[in-house]
């Protein structure tokens, strides 16, 4: 049994009840086989794979808070600090009923390599809670956030661990969290990113993940002699990532015809109206039924099991921007049958492993979220830089740096894949390229720092 197989067996034995984490580890280690086999003695002697798949620490805590009826509620909070070999732990806080240790570990593990790819000095971590902000009043959200930070503050800091937003954690929640940290510590420091512009936030942070996804997608297509202008796109989701991916796609001359939320999806052959979508989702916080009611060209479809949703339409580019494992093997078959050119992930691991392999085997240009959605964390790191220097850059400055970072990420993952002849379906294996490029930087730092 080789070193990779030995470590995979150990990880599966130790984390048997954590399917999301195991899926992420298996995907990464399988793609790293050529790198590890080329340096197996060195990596095995230094237990590199054992160390990189085991978090530095995982913190789980009780979060009690009082609802509007005076009833005490209790949620579970998490922070997994995975690896800080190249910088402070960095990763979002997810507030969603599905949150558990497995999901937070999978996200933290992925974050290590994603953050490495940004070319910026940030390590990997993730956190969150099974608290559901939907349907809660502002007072209830504040009560939860203050209780959550009353425990979390012990483990974070501007040079230690810098959390950010994620699903369920937007500007409102970040504000409440930052206020409580400042109140407890008496420090005004860049301990969170995604802050409001009046208290240390960065311009272009809101747009960063979606814009970055399109910058990388455009670089990918250009490298293959394809012009994004005139292409038709399917996007899933209707949160920040999806909205600004749609906006940037339109700016680049493409047309996005779908978006979705937890209850259903929109098909709009005239192209999604971004201004209307923003009004429905960012201002009214309403369902997509309101978009359809205000847009004659749009069709609304309620979500039903067994349907392909946004992936059933004939499109050139697919951009999954909703949540993990949303695009399965049947969806992948539908996309391939309809002649999709590329799939680039805006969400974290939205494509199942089986679907990923099918897309790649059928010659689809596929870039996973580790590289494709790194724009968000890259701009968070730029926010950290601005906070450290007590400066505020213009939108154009931040957006220009973001575009450069995403183009560099594409170049690096393409180069890494080619160095190890990583191909699948006759095309460059960008998933392997991302894992290799991210892994090499982290491992070099780990080896330089000794056993720690």
Where are these regions (language model features)?
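Glycine/serine-rich phosphate-binding loop and adjoining beta1-alpha1 elements at the start
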Residues: 96, 115-229
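Adenosine-phosphate binding glycine-rich loop
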Residues: 2-24, 220, 336-452
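Glycine-rich phosphate/diphosphate-binding loop of Rossmann-like nucleotide-binding domains
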Residues: 193-196, 201-314
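Rossmann-like adenosine-cofactor binding region
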Residues: 264-366, 371
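General beta-strand structural signal in soluble alpha/beta enzymes
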Residues: 106, 160-164, 187-192, 258-261, ...
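Structured beta-strand/loop patches that form or line metal/cofactor-binding pockets in enzymes
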Residues: 42-71
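Conserved active-site and cofactor/substrate-binding residues in soluble primary-metabolism enzymes
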Residues: 2, 16-23, 27, 43, ...
């Amino acid at each position: 049994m080789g070193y990779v197989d030995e470590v995979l067996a150990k990880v599966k034995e130790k984390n048997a009840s954590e399917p999301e984490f195991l899926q992420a580890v298996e995907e990464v280690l399988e793609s790293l086989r050529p790198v590890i086999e080329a340096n197996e003695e060195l990596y095995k002697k230094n237990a590199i794979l054992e160390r990189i798949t085991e978090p530095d620490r995982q913190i789980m805590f009780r979060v009690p808070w009082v609802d509007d009826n005076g009833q005490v509620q209790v949620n579970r909070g998490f922070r997994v600090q995975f690896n800080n070999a190249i910088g402070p732990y960095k990763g979002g806080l997810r507030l969603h009923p599905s949150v558990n240790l497995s999901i937070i570990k999978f996200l933290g593990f992925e974050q290590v390599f994603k953050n490495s790819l940004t070319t910026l000095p940030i390590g990997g971590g993730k956190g969150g809670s099974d608290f559901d902000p939907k349907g809660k009043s502002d007072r209830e959200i504040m009560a939860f956030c203050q209780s959550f930070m009353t425990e979390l503050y012990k483990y974070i800091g501007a040079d230690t661990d810098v959390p950010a937003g994620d699903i369920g954690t937007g500007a409102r929640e970040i504000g409440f969290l930052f206020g409580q940290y400042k109140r407890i510590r008496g420090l005004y420091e860049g301990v969170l990113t995604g802050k409001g512009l009046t208290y240390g936030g960065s311009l272009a942070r809101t747009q960063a993940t979606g814009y970055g996804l399109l910058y990388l997608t455009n670089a990918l297509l250009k490298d293959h002699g394809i012009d994004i202008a005139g292409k038709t796109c399917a996007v899933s989701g209707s949160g920040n990532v999806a909205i600004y991916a749609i906006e940037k796609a339109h700016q680049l001359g493409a047309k996005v015809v779908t978006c979705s939320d937890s209850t259903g999806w929109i098909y709009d052959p005239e192209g999604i109206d971004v201004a209307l979508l923003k009004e429905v989702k960012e201002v009214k916080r309403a369902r997509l039924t309101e978009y359809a009611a205000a847009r004659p060209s749009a069709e609304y479809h309620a979500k039903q099991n067994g349907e392909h949703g946004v992936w059933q339409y004939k499109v050139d580019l697919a951009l999954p921007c909703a949540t993990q494992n949303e695009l399965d093997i049947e969806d992948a078959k539908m996309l391939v049958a309809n002649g999709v050119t590329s799939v680039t992930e805006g969400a974290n691991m939205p494509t199942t492993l089986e679907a990923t392999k099918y897309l790649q085997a059928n010659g689809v240009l596929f870039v996973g979220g580790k590289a494709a959605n790194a724009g968000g964390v890259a701009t968070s790191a730029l926010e950290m830089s601005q906070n450290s220097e007590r400066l505020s850059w213009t939108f154009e400055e931040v957006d220009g740096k973001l575009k450069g970072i995403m183009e560099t990420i594409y170049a690096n993952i393409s180069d890494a894949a080619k160095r190890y002849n990583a191909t699948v379906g006759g095309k460059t294996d960008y998933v392997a390229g991302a894992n290799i490029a991210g892994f090499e930087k982290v491992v070099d730092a780990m080896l330089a720092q000794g056993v720690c």
